[in-house]
């Protein structure tokens, strides 16, 4: 991490969620709610899943109820507290994920809206690290914004950095880091379903 905490888009963006984490939880309670079940349908029972940027822990609960073994990671202390009621969670920066977990630890990596605050220059390193954390033929789901502008957005509860990925740019980034693309959904978000090869 080269930025100081005062200038780091990830640190500033993550801190903004502390203003009202309950409102965030309520706003996104049903957002893309069918995706976790689709993801787990690709996995064997009892799979180890990394919920990257787990937020309040909605998907940790869903994965646990489905018989899987999720662990969440988030940088925001308020989200860590909330998510820990749903299952195992640790506090950490996803940009340093390879120093937190050992290679080939997970059957699946779930990154729903957790890469949105990374700058494009950081995404290649993070995707390569995620690939290393997956077991052979492990699955990745990643969802990022496809519309809007890249840059700072002042919202009612704080300032956040968003990186948008128009057209096929995110799919290209995932493929270039050694993943096989199984499916891509385009819309306001780009959703990539991929496998480690």
Give the ranges of each region predicted by the language model:
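Class I (Rossmann-like) S-adenosyl-L-methionine-dependent methyltransferase catalytic domain
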Residues: 1-101, 122-125, 129, 139-197
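A short SAM/SAH-binding and catalytic strip from SAM-dependent methyltransferases
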Residues: 108-121
């Amino acid at each position: 991490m080269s930025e100081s905490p005062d200038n780091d888009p990830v640190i500033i963006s993550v801190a903004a969620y502390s203003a009202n984490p309950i409102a965030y939880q309520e706003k996104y309670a049903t957002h893309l709610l069918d995706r976790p079940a689709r993801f787990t349908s690709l996995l064997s029972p009892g799979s180890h899943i990394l919920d990257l940027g787990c937020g309040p822990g909605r998907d940790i609960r869903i994965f646990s109820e489905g018989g899987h073994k999720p662990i969440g990671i988030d940088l925001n202390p308020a989200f860590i507290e909330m998510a820990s009621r749903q299952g195992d969670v640790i506090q950490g920066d996803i940009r340093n994920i390879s120093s937190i977990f050992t290679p080939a630890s997970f059957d699946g990596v779930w990154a729903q809206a957790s890469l949105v605050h990374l700058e494009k220059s950081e995404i290649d390193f993070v995707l390569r690290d995620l690939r290393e954390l997956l077991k052979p033929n492990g699955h990745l789901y990643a969802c990022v914004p496809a519309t809007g502008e890249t840059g700072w957005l002042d919202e009612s509860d704080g300032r956040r950095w968003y990186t948008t990925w128009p057209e096929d740019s995110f799919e290209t980034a995932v493929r270039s880091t050694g993943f096989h693309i199984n499916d891509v959904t385009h819309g306001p978000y780009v959703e990539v379903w991929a496998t480690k090869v």
